Amino acid sequence: MRFATQKCTLKRFLTAAAVVAVLTACGCSRPVNNPRPLADYAENTLFSSFSGRSPKTLDPQVSYSSDETIYTYTIYEPPYGYHYLKRPYEVIPKTAERVVTPVYLDKNGRELAPGADVSASAFSRYVIPIKKGIRYAPHPAFAKDAAGNYRYHRLTDAVAEKLTNPLDLPEKGTRELTADDYVYGIKRIGDVRTVSPVLGILSSHIVGLKAFSETFAQALKEAEAAGRPAPDIRDFPVEGVKARDSHTLEITVYGRYPQFANWLTMAFFAPVPWEATAFYGANPLLKKNNVTLEAWPVGTGPYRLAS
């Protein structure tokens, strides 16, 4: 009786499987919801979904979409990158001279001896040497006149209204990458006007970033209420972020956070020259023509955006 029951069950299974196979075969020949003709799939073509306008933003402290990384990671250069041919991926220097080992500090800021108790580490300090001789792609933001004044940090309405591509301006300049550019980029994460998606998590790791963000936001409100120009983020320090000299970047984070080396490979930590934000803020009419950092990045990478 037990064998007969198993046999009957097997028959039902085979019958059901045959029905499914027939239906599947029919479905493969004529898909119900196929968005493209079958002939399109005969070629070696990659199809991908596309939603909205892409790229939406190329601001390195804001961009967080995979559709934008092909631009941001070839135009901008964080301190570190990855060796993608190694398994597992290895963090390697990009604009940094080397991948550094952090110095661990106690709650009083004193350096701990090697092999000290992990629980005694209140802070980790990364002192990153930046390579010399790296320069920004030519851009009108850096252009100066014979007297050394920036040519395009003040634009008339007549010029700004007609400008749709900043590279159409006749004069361009460049300068060397410095550690201050990385400090400026990190401060932009804390600037509420930037609306960086990583401010929340990084403010809990980078010493002083939360306090900077709150202090600067208050300064913006006070300036607006008094009818004064917006303050400059360069005038507001972040306790744990500083340039020791022109080519040495120092970042201090809370506790031991080895994943911070991976953060330093991301475009959020790309350098931004203050001249770029000064240029794009030279006249409000530029934003109407989409002449902004979101659309026209200024970086040190091997590529630049052109039209």
Model-derived features: positions:
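Bacterial N-terminal signal peptides that target proteins for export
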Residues: 3-15
